[in-house]
């Protein structure tokens, strides 16, 4: 089973990153994608992935929260990072109109620039969309024929938004949000709509600790070693075998990010 979204650069992991990776391996995780959210963290993510060859890979990008930082220098940094074998996708990029930590215009500019970079480099994109679906689709759609693949990470949208993402050919990343007894109920009902070959799972660790884990972890910090819990729950709600789902999400990740 492959975890496509781990924020291993987070300071929450500063004291025990190696142990976190070991616990993930011991839990049966077969690969992890470390998320880059700005230039510095993308460089850090690449170094962390380089230290775990064959198990960790990384993305290089600028999250919409950091879109105001976008510059030609940052674009050049991402381009250089993309030459590294561990860097397998551009992102995390997209739009976030919930927190609005960067102006909408800055977000759209940085998003479009990263889609252009991914198209130029023939790399898949790791996408973020929160409360911005209409503009997200408007910026993304013209680039789709030129992209080598795309996954919308941490999908928490509506049925209409899911159907639109699937119509655009996107893969869909599901996190432990779906395990939330209150917030995750609508998303839970949408799981059977996602084609088997376009479903990916992720922890988004250290965030989004699954709320239905029993016994509850002593720490509120999420870890990639909890991915098996998400796999088991999603398999139950989709009405399929957890073992088959674990194998399939690994295959899907390796196909999208061209790791096979």
UniProtKB/Swiss-Prot annotation:
Residue sites binding a divalent metal cation per the record: 92, 128, 153
One Gene Ontology cellular component: cytoplasm
EC number: 3.1.11.-, 3.1.13.-
Molecular function as annotated in GO: 3'-5'-RNA exonuclease activity; magnesium ion binding; single-stranded DNA 3'-5' DNA exonuclease activity
Function: 3'-5' exonuclease that prefers single-stranded DNA and RNA. May play a role in the H(2)O(2)-induced DNA damage repair.
Name of encoding gene: tatD
Family as reported in the entry's similarity comment: Belongs to the metallo-dependent hydrolases superfamily. TatD-type hydrolase family. TatD subfamily.
Transmembrane segments: none
Lineage of producing organism: Bacteria, Pseudomonadati, Pseudomonadota, Gammaproteobacteria, Enterobacterales
NCBIfam families assigned: PRK10425.1
PROSITE patterns listed in its UniProt record: TATD_3
Chief localisation class: cytoplasm
Subunit structure: Monomer.
InterPro entries: DNase_TatD-rel_CS, Exonuc_TatD, Metal_Hydrolase, TatD-like, TatD-type_Hydrolase
UniProt feature coiled coil, ranges: none
Top enzyme class: hydrolase
Pfam families: TatD_DNase
Keyword set, alphabetical order: Cytoplasm, Exonuclease, Hydrolase, Magnesium, Metal-binding, Nuclease
Subcellular location field: Cytoplasm
Cofactor: Mg(2+)
Alphabetized CDD domains for the sequence: TatD_DNAse (cd01310)
Nucleotidyltransferase found in the keyword field: no
Name listed for the protein in its UniProt record: 3'-5' ssDNA/RNA exonuclease TatD
Gene3D superfamilies membership: Metal-dependent hydrolases
